[in-house]
Amino acid sequence: MEHYISLFVKSVFIENMALSFFLGMCTFLAVSKKVSTAFGLGVAVTVVLGISVPVNQLVYSLILKDGALIDGVDLSFLNFITFIGVIAALVQILEMILDKYFPALYNALGIFLPLITVNCAIFGGVSFMVQRDYNFAESVVYGIGAGTGWMLAIVALAGITEKMKYADVPAGLRGLGITFITVGLMALGFMSFSGVQL
């Protein structure tokens, strides 16, 4: 149990997808204007990561891995296309659920919801799972932890951005300029966790 807790904490703080690996920056910067929208996208990314990492782990270990189906047959050259297909299917299902049950959030996310399919944070989580050879339980914990870390980062950035509307930001830095500086300072803050050994 301690191993899973340390894996979760590590994936949220030490190896944060957004602030340590800088993955998923497109939607991270574009949807971080309001906390409510950022939280909704963060939950969507967490759900997709929490489902796609373990599902892709099963696909990899039962079908694609060397010798999984037949001894001597290695289908790992199909990793990328298979993982992207699974992620795309999961995002389509999530999009239909949000459209039916949460139309306000669906409309607020707009074009960025289908873009979760090509969000490199999602694919990065799946790639890290293969690279680190996680089992199914570790994949579930890592997927949820990585999504939670990404959500924590985007909600924190949205909260800071909302507060900065009332600050006297120099004209040349308004918009993305001050956002990049803020993200850099947040990343420096998260670097303090890199010395923690779990």
Curated annotation (Swiss-Prot):
InterPro entries tied to this protein: NqrDE/RnfAE, NqrDE/RnfAE_oxidrdctase, NqrE
Quaternary structure, from the entry: Composed of six subunits; NqrA, NqrB, NqrC, NqrD, NqrE and NqrF.
Organism taxonomic ancestry: Bacteria, Pseudomonadati, Pseudomonadota, Gammaproteobacteria, Pasteurellales
NCBIfam families, sorted: nqrE
Gene: nqrE
Catalytic activity: a ubiquinone + n Na(+)(in) + NADH + H(+) = a ubiquinol + n Na(+)(out) + NAD(+)
Family membership noted in the UniProt record: Belongs to the NqrDE/RnfAE family.
GO molecular function, one term: oxidoreductase activity, acting on NAD(P)H, quinone or similar compound as acceptor
Protein name: Na(+)-translocating NADH-quinone reductase subunit E
Enzyme Commission code(s) on record: 7.2.1.1
Gene Ontology cellular component annotations, sorted alphabetically: Gram-negative-bacterium-type cell wall; plasma membrane
Cellular localization per UniProt: Cell inner membrane
Presence of keyword Translocase: yes
Domain of life, per lineage: Bacteria
Keyword field contains Hydrolase: no
Enzyme class: translocase
Spans through the membrane: 11-31, 35-55, 77-97, 110-130, 140-160, 176-196
Swiss-Prot/TrEMBL keywords: Cell inner membrane, Cell membrane, Ion transport, Membrane, NAD, Sodium, Sodium transport, Translocase, Transmembrane, Transmembrane helix, Transport, Ubiquinone
Record GO biological process: respiratory electron transport chain; sodium ion transport
Primary role: NQR complex catalyzes the reduction of ubiquinone-1 to ubiquinol by two successive reactions, coupled with the transport of Na(+) ions from the cytoplasm to the periplasm. NqrA to NqrE are probably involved in the second step, the conversion of ubisemiquinone to ubiquinol.
Topology with respect to the bilayer: Multi-pass membrane protein
Major site of localization recorded for this protein: membrane
